[in-house]
């Protein structure tokens, strides 16, 4: 079986359906003997350019291991699902399980915001 990296963009009005979509794709891959090595829900983000007059969308990244038939079925599902605005599939040499740069950046930003919130507010000196 081969390794693939898939990113798909979901219409923002359909964001509530993303967990169900992910679970459906996971079940489809597992039923055919494949494996999901990494799954990252990047959430709602600003797009570089509008697609169908939409400026924000919900992004999802999956690194999977599957056969060609399973991949074709996934891509067929993306193509005919109106909620999926775009998708990209890249063949990888090996399974990727480390966090993506996007998630590393988000974690660092969250840690910084958490540190600022935990820091005590400076008290003015009483004279």
Swiss-Prot record:
One BP term from GO: translation
From which domain of life does this come? Bacteria
Xref: Pfam families: Ribosomal_S6
One Gene Ontology CC term in the entry: cytosolic small ribosomal subunit
Show the InterPro entries listed in the entry: Ribosomal_bS6, Ribosomal_bS6_sf, Ribosomal_S6_plastid/chlpt, Transl_elong_EF1B/ribsomal_bS6
Keyword set for this entry?
Answer: Ribonucleoprotein, Ribosomal protein, RNA-binding, rRNA-binding
| Low complexity composition-biased segments | 115-127
Q: List the disulfide bonds.
A: none
Keyword Ribosomal protein among UniProt keywords: yes
Q: Which GO terms describe its molecular function?
A: small ribosomal subunit rRNA binding; structural constituent of ribosome
Instruction: Outline the segment boundaries, as ranges, of region: Disordered.
Output: 101-127
Q: Which family does it belong to?
A: Belongs to the bacterial ribosomal protein bS6 family.
Role of this protein: Binds together with bS18 to 16S ribosomal RNA.
Q: Which HAMAP family match?
A: Ribosomal_bS6
Under PANTHER family, the record lists:
MITOCHONDRIAL 28S RIBOSOMAL PROTEIN S6, SMALL RIBOSOMAL SUBUNIT PROTEIN BS6M
Q: What is this protein called?
A: Small ribosomal subunit protein bS6
